[in-house]
């Protein structure tokens, strides 16, 4: 994936800290909300929501848990959106090299919880990246999954994302 960005009511969360396990088996990122205004009125003061992103790589799939907890004394309603994209750039392109030609790519929805990115390279090898979301997003497009969340005071919810890639043939979507 070239992009996997989390936004809260169209704003970037604030970084509290992160930790990579010594064996590189998981990455944990702690975030919180900035001040959130709606129609010029402060609706969420900074630091009311705690967001924990945990990413684990296992058997060719990247699994991510996004945990959200309301530390406020009132219910909190907000949108949490995961923006994503895949450009299938190779190592040389990532380092700034320009290619005279590229393969062809497409992205499509496979249902209410799945997105598939496809790319056929100049080597005629098909590469795919599949994304699976649980629970089902409120809205899903080929580059964004949005959940409308309502959390009571001190309530927590978890969202899960799995991303897998394959060469040749179809991607079996992760579950």
Q: Which residues does each PLM region occupy?
A:
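Beta-strand-rich N-terminal accessory domains
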Residues: 1-43, 58, 83, 164
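Polysaccharide-binding surfaces and accessory modules of carbohydrate-active proteins
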Residues: 39-41, 45-149, 153, 157, ...
